[in-house]
Amino acid sequence: MKDVKALKLMTLNDVLSQINGDMTLGIGTGSTMELLLPQMAQLIKERGYNITGVCTSNKIAFLAKELGIKICEINDVDHIDLAIDGADEVDPSLNIIKGGGGALFREKVIDEMASRFVVVVDETKMVQYLGETFKLPVEVDKFNWYHILRKIESYADIKVERRVNEDVAFITDNGNYILDCKLPKGIDPYKFHEYLIHLTGVFETGYFLDMADQVIVGTQEGVKILEK
């Protein structure tokens, strides 16, 4: 049986086939992209592609630079041709939860900007409903984070925790906190997103709804390509 890393690597050829000679590329954050990015950089170099990357986190920007990928800031481009990113959960409608790496705000900005958004996952990320195996991240202001937490818990039977890293509050690249929400089955993601996004102090949610153009899934039986 193949492990998760092997399942992700199975998707490599399908990911690389999306990249062509002259494009602005949105580069996602997380373990999947860290695994695939060196191969993407090698392809760009070998074929002499004129690729400019727009990165979703400081960490992935540092890695891309080390690999020789030309990068720029989001405000230096007026379009993104293709965004490639991982996901924490994907439901049967190809709706997604992201934000396990804490970069959900920048990821959503870049993925929404892209003409095409391709998601790469292994089969363990496929779920029947969003929140089945992964908590929903919500990026919030430090000032009133606890009051936001209480309001989220009052919405339904939702357990909310402020994310910590080695006993210290996790801080996003934007200087905010992350609240991780354990969702019960039956939560409507569209309605819950609307509730959250209208709370003062909420910057963004980890719901990526109706955004993915294609999901590439590494499975024990091979690679599956899912599209709406």
Swiss-Prot record:
It is an enzyme of class 5 (isomerase). CDD domains: RPI_A. Keywords: Isomerase. The active site is at E107 (proton acceptor). It catalyses: aldehydo-D-ribose 5-phosphate = D-ribulose 5-phosphate. PANTHER family: RIBOSE-5-PHOSPHATE ISOMERASE. Homodimer. This is Ribose-5-phosphate isomerase A. It comes from Staphylococcus aureus (strain MRSA252). The lineage of its organism: Bacteria, Bacillati, Bacillota, Bacilli, Bacillales. The gene is rpiA.
